[in-house]
A protein has these predicted regions:
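Small-residue (G/A/S/T)-rich helix-start motifs and N-terminal tracts that mark the onset
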Residues: 1-119, 128-142, 147, 151-273
Length: 273
């Protein structure tokens, strides 16, 4: 079989304008499955990323022992205490799973992905629960690994990944039927047929929590109707743009994930220009 030519995408996708008669149900119910003892901040940042990304409703599902801490992180999202059954989770249009969830949650992650047929963003600890060949879905999953996580998925050293980021990302996305967002300088987004290399962002974003914000942001864009490739591409661009705006105000050295959240509104406005 002939491999189709790779399309290089240069334009940043846009969200459609909101209708005047719309309501919160039109902009997606996002369920964030994240957090554990010592990592409640990951759940908060992911939930807040979904809110800033425009989701109509956000619920953060986390272990009961951190639920009160997570609930205090933002009054605009709801919380839900996780059980050991993915089938008990509240209904959602989009699921983001992984940030701070813990490596012990593999069975739960696999159960969740088996129960939920809609769009998913898989990040962080949830990636460790999966192996190549297990990603096939009716709606392509969005995977957001950093180079170390991607190296495990492809069974290659990190040095090999960094030496051929685009080539390995495209091949993996094509084989597995996913949208892959490979983080790092020049984030690569590909569905195996199209590819874009993100041009926004700066070294100040190399700090804990920034990836959690990105996961929530992409989930929100999916909830508003963007297809997986477009949601990942716009998410990467807006996330990096927020980082660039934040660096102007606080500098690269002092930049935190909360600064990204503060500047996401301006970044999304800029994406429409």
């Amino acid at each position: 079989m002939t491999t189709p030519p790779l399309e290089r995408v240069l334009d940043v996708p846009r969200l459609p304008p909101r209708r005047g008669d719309s309501h919160k149900g039109d902009y997606g119910r996002v369920l964030v499955v994240a957090g554990s003892r010592g990592f409640s901040g990951a759940a908060v940042l992911c939930g807040r990323g979904a809110l800033r990304g425009g989701a109509g409703l956000v619920t953060v599902a986390c272990p009961r022992d951190v639920q009160d801490v997570v609930a205090a992180g933002d009054p605009c999202f709801m919380t839900y205490a996780l059980t050991d059954r993915a089938g008990d989770l509240p209904k959602a249009d989009v699921v983001a799973v992984g940030p701070g969830l813990g490596l012990h949650a593999g069975d739960f992650v696999r159960d969740l992905l088996a129960h939920f047929a809609g769009p998913v963003v898989i990040d962080a600890d949830a990636l460790a629960a999966l192996v190549p060949g297990s990603f096939a879905r009716s709606v392509p999953a969005v995977l957001t690994p950093h180079p170390g996580e991607f190296a495990r998925l492809v069974g290659r050293p990190v040095t090999d990944v960094q030496a051929d980021r685009e080539g390995l990302a495209v091949a993996f996305a094509r084989t597995e039927g996913v949208v892959l967002l490979l983080k790092g300088s020049g984030t690569v987004v590909t569905d195996g047929v199209r590819v874009t290399t993100n041009t926004t962002g700066n070294p100040g974003m190399a700090t804990g929590g920034c990836g959690d914000v990105l996961t929530g942001l992409i989930a929100a864009l999916l909830g508003q109707g963007l297809p997986p490739f477009e949601a990942a591409a716009l998410g990467a661009w807006a996330h990096g743009r927020a980082g660039d705006l934040a660096a102007v105000r606080v500098g690269e050295v002092s930049l935190t994930a909360v600064d990204l959240l503060d500047h996401l509104p301006a970044a999304l406005i800029a994406s429409h220009r």
